[in-house]
Amino acid sequence: MALSIRDIKNIINETISDYTGNCNIISKWKEPLISVASADDLYFEKLKRIISEKHKNPDELLPGAESVITYFLPFAEEIPKSNEAGRDASLIWARAYIETNRLISIINKNIQYELEAKGYNSAAPAATDNFSKKDLISYWSHKHVAWIAGLGKFGLHKMLITEAGSAGRIGSLVVDFKLPVNKRPVQEFCLYYKNGSCKECIKSCVFGALEENSFNRQLCYSILKENAARYNSSADVCGKCTVGVPCAIL
């Protein structure tokens, strides 16, 4: 018998608990969200047109794919709060990025271990660095995959906004068994798309990479690299458009 959604959520929560028990981990997370898409959802094929023809379908990552599991790890409120002031990404925000990416890797490995023991197969794309450094296009966009799975909706800042907000990280796995599929939300979580009342994310992007009708991904990425160099780490982060805004924490 394969894993249920409850089983998967238990693995995620147990992994978080074990991980935060490590004295070197300073980041904290709120209750994770999980959402599932059918591997044959027609929107996966559409991503080849929306994002890139190189974007993978679930069955290109895992032959015989049946379901795509996505989950969101919301940051505790002090993490986005730490990143509101100043031009540079805060150290707390940078560490949360690194520590959450590691956590996602461990969560995926733990889920895969349980699945393998039950005779099932899976594929788990990395939480980050799964994109071309030349054109900055991902072969597996976690946020688009999560949108297909109904985990949230996109905001003006091009980030996924979930029921818990947008300040956090997304992980995903492709599996070869069927799980109950979630419906995509109808309501808008972004106030700009809901009633035109908010453009705070644009104001927060002091670099001018984010505009109402455009996004300069090369400029944005240059800021991410600046912060990575500043902290001498893999924390290619900024997040200014995601913090200090109404949709950061919901």
Regions found by a protein language model. Give the residues of each.
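Non-catalytic, usually N-terminal nucleic-acid engagement modules in DNA/RNA processing proteins
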Residues: 1-96
